[in-house]
Design a protein with these regions (language model features):
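Glycan-processing catalytic domains of CAZymes
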Residues: 23-402
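Bacterial Sec-dependent signal peptides at the C-terminal "C-region" and cleavage site
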Residues: 10-26
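Sec-dependent signal peptide recognition
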Residues: 2-9
Length: 402
């Protein structure tokens, strides 16, 4: 960062970085939920690598207990549905909207040579008859995609799709974002600006080569959105301190990058980016407390509104080769969250709501991990053991506000 030190005052004036909203005391809390779109057939990349008809449901089906007290496999109550089917997606939309969720944040993958996992959103969500019951937005999952579906321990994690995109490709992506997503009537706007989140800010800066070039690239998307009739783009950064995926390297100074680049807000994807898992089944409430400590720190240091996260669970064992010895060897061979009961999840939701409302001028937004991270053990969709209990927890805390 020493090579690109600039006057922070000048940068903030140029990029117009977001400030905390005022007079939010009487606003309801917006509940967003991440959505991981790898549960549909017909993706060209998946079919080339895994075979026709492959989806991540195959890993869910094959999962097995790896240690005493380990609950696997998890069986979806609705069956192994295809999310690119508008009828299947309509069921998800109704369930989310009926239980207090306002928006899906789709994990969004776009590479130099085209999209990945896009048919869930393009053919399922946007073509569902009830699509307007939920807002939607995008988190650009701008990380390298490596072969971990499943991963055999000790082997090289093959790089399948590198994250880097050319300047020309980036401009094409910006046009696509504005035309096909940001201007949809149910795209999630904050103060008239399209919410757009970046998963890996370090990789984002590396892509453009410098802070100045990255900031200019962000402004190009803002200007395209304004030209299309919006008030701009609400740029959100996913902050994390502890890497999870093998391709992750946390930035040296997240707070500095937020200011230098002009992000409007910050958030987190999952508690595990901020909470250690010392035990095979680390207690859910301990992870919650560790995450809350990060939240308090982020509010003080980041200088922009921070949207907290509530994580339902963690168990990435379905992504591990079943023939390998189990241990805490590194993702996806990691320890898990235990005691993540619907009751403890509900308590975490209530505590998060209370902390949000305790700040009369703070943001009224949170996100949940996740709607359907089945192979990472964090999902609100019903399974055959707990039914709708996790969705009912969201409804009990937030449903009456809608």
């Amino acid at each position: 960062m020493s090579k690109i030190k600039l006057s922070l005052f000048c940068i903030l004036a140029l990029c117009g970085c977001g400030q905390a909203s005022q007079n939010t005391e009487n606003q309801p809390v917006t509940v967003a939920c991440y959505y991981f779109p790898n549960y549909h057939t017909g993706d060209p990349r998946n079919e080339a690598a895994k075979g026709v008809g492959w989806t991540e449901w195959e890993l869910v089906k094959k999962a097995r207990p790896r240690f005493a007290g380990h609950r696997q496999p998890k069986v979806p109550l609705w069956g192994y549905t295809d999310e690119r089917d508008p009828l299947a997606m309509a069921q998800k939309i109704d369930a989310a909207a009926n239980h207090g969720i306002d928006a899906f944040i789709f994990d969004w993958y776009m590479y130099e040579d085209g999209p990945f996992l896009n048919r869930c959103l393009d053919e399922g969500f946007l073509k569902a008859k009830n699509t307007n019951r939920l807002k939607f937005s995008l988190m650009w999952a701008n990380h390298d995609w490596v072969e971990i579906h499943p991963y055999k321990r000790g082997t090289d994690q093959q790089l399948l799709y590198p994250a880097k995109v050319s300047p020309k490709r980036y401009d094409e992506i910006c046009d696509h974002l504005v035309k096909d997503y940001f201007t949809k009537p149910n795209y999630w706007l904050i103060d008239g600006k399209a919410y757009f989140s970046i998963y890996d800010v370090q990789k984002f800066v590396e892509n453009f080569g410098s802070i100045e070039a990255t900031r200019e690239a962000m402004n190009r998307l803002r200007n395209k959105a304004i030209a299309a009739g919006l008030k701009g783009v609400h740029w959100n950064i996913v902050a994390w301190g502890l890497p999870i995926l093998p391709v992750e390297n946390p930035p040296a100074n997240t707070a500095e990058l937020i200011q230098l680049l002009g992000f409007d807000s910050a958030t987190s994807y999952v508690w595990i980016h901020h909470a250690q898992l010392p035990d095979v089944q680390t207690d859910y409430n301990k992870a919650r407390d560790a995450y809350f400590a990060h939240w308090d720190k982020a509010k003080k240091e980041y200088g922009v509104p921070y949207f907290p996260n509530v994580t339902m669970g963690w168990d990435s064992s379905p992504r591990c080769d079943l023939n390998d010895e189990w241990g805490n060897w590194g993702y996806p061979f990691t320890n898990t969250l235990g005691n993540n009961t619907p009751e403890n999840f509900k308590t975490a939701l209530q505590q998060t709501k209370d902390k949000l409302l305790a700040d009369p001028n703070g943001p009224r937004i949170l996100n949940i991990n996740c709607w359907n991270e089945w192979t990472e053990g964090s999902y609100l969709e019903p399974d055959t053991k707990t039914g709708m209990a996790y969705l009912e927890a969201v409804r009990d805390i937030f449903g009456n506000e809608k």
